[in-house]
Swiss-Prot record:
Species of provenance: Homo sapiens (Human)
Gene coding for it: INHBC
Glycosylation site positions: 110, 143, 161
Subcellular location: Secreted
GO terms, molecular function: cytokine activity; growth factor activity; hormone activity; transforming growth factor beta receptor binding
Signal peptide start and end residues: 1-18
Subunit structure: Homodimeric or heterodimeric through association with alpha and beta subunits, linked by one or more disulfide bonds. Inhibins are heterodimers of one alpha and one beta subunit. Activins are homo- or heterodimers of beta subunits only.
Keyword field: Cleavage on pair of basic residues, Disulfide bond, Glycoprotein, Growth factor, Hormone, Secreted, Signal
Propeptide stretches in the record: 19-236
GO cellular component: extracellular region; extracellular space
A Pfam family hit: TGF_beta
Name of the molecule in the record: Inhibin beta C chain
Length: 352
């Protein structure tokens, strides 16, 4: 039991701390294991805790303000590169994209106030909004052109009254969705977690609401946020096959529907967590993926033979390469977040 718990912890822990205790056997080297179903439950539980920890969540979000299918479909069309699979691989600074749907307040026929809340779950700390755009749906009488003023309101000192930071003027001549790129004042407000906009019709008296906010036309802000960090590309190691007992990568798939997370995780449907298992003879210690040259293997074998009294037990089968998980999900404010969670997928295993 203890051996299997240590194994599962090792699978999800950073590779830099995989150092076996002196005189002890590595927990991934074929010691006593749990029953297959118990091991599966343990790995699923650890996968859930790992995702929540890396999203800075104490528990899975509860959707108090569900988004309609029509609004979700419209919003996703404006995301750049919605993930089709679970893996991404690049060397860019890590970024995420957030879609925040508006809460409407203090509105009249000719003026609409929109409030947007940006959670700090995933983007806590050094987040910086790089781009932000307002998407809103306008319904106008035919053959008319109206001027729309968009005001960016920010909180004053000590979070007191809202004050005008900047404003934009738009000529709107057709019904439908319209996009307004937002400048640094609005981006700074998004970075701080809250943005308030006022949309005002200039020189016109509307007979009915021009800015629609129903289920299918709910305004939203799409923001691109820089989080920091880089992904590294590593070569693949050896996959477990048949009855092999050597260090290898064992495939393990986490199905979000199976664990009851499909309501708040939009994409993907699951991901390949994988883990490392198998024995590590001393002569292949320190060889990532057991893929070093024959000459290196010979040198390590000679080193092992000259180590008096040394037995196989000081080297562990550990992850040597990981990849991020690309996730599209609802946060606790019902915003849609697209982000890459680093080090979630074990790509290769080797002996420490």
């Amino acid at each position: 039991m203890t051996s299997s718990l240590l194994l599962a912890f090792l699978l999800l822990a950073p590779t830099t701390v995989a150092t076996p205790r002196a005189g002890g056997q590595c927990p991934a080297c074929g010691g006593p294991t749990l029953e297959l179903e118990s091991q599966r439950e343990l790995l699923l539980d650890l996968a859930k805790r790992s995702i929540l920890d890396k999203l800075h969540l104490t528990q899975r979000p509860t959707l108090n303000r569900p988004v309609s299918r029509a609004a979700l479909r419209t919003a996703l069309q404006h995301l750049h590169g919605v993930p089709q699979g679970a893996l991404l691989e690049d060397n860019r600074e890590q970024e995420c994209e957030i879609i925040s749907f508006a809460e409407t307040g203090l509105s009249t026929i000719n003026q609409t106030r929109l409030d947007f809340h940006f959670s700090s779950d995933r983007t806590a700390g050094d987040r910086e909004v790089q781009q932000a755009s307002l998407m809103f749906f306008v319904q106008l009488p035919s053959n008319t052109t109206w001027t729309l003023k968009v005001r960016v309101l920010v909180l004053g000192p000590h979070n007191t009254n809202l004050t005008l930071a900047t404003q934009y003027l738009l000529e709107v001549d057709a019904s439908g969705w319209h996009q307004l790129p937002l400048g640094p004042e609005a981006q700074a407000a998004c970075s701080q977690g809250h943005l308030t906009l006022e949309l005002v019709l200039e020189g016109q008296v509307a007979q009915s609401s021009v800015i629609l906010g129903g289920a299918a036309h709910r305004p939203f802000v799409a923001a691109r946020v820089r989080v920091g960090g880089k992904h590294q590309i590593h070569r693949r190691g050896i996959d477990c096959q048949g009855g092999s007992r050597m260090c290898c990568r064992q495939e393990f798939f986490v199905d979000f529907r199976e664990i009851g997370w499909h309501d708040w995780i939009i994409q993907p449907e699951g991901y390949a967590m994988n883990f490392c298992i198998g024995q590590c003879p001393l002569h292949i210690a320190g060889m990532p993926g057991i893929a070093a040259s024959f000459h290196t293997a010979v040198l390590n074998l000679l080193k092992a033979n000259t180590a008096a009294g040394t037995t196989g037990g000081g080297s562990c089968c550990v992850p040597t390469a990981r990849r991020p998980l690309s996730l599209l999900y609802y946060d606790r404010d019902s915003n849609i977040v697209k982000t890459d969670i680093p080090d979630m997928v074990v790509e290769a295993c080797g002996c420490s």
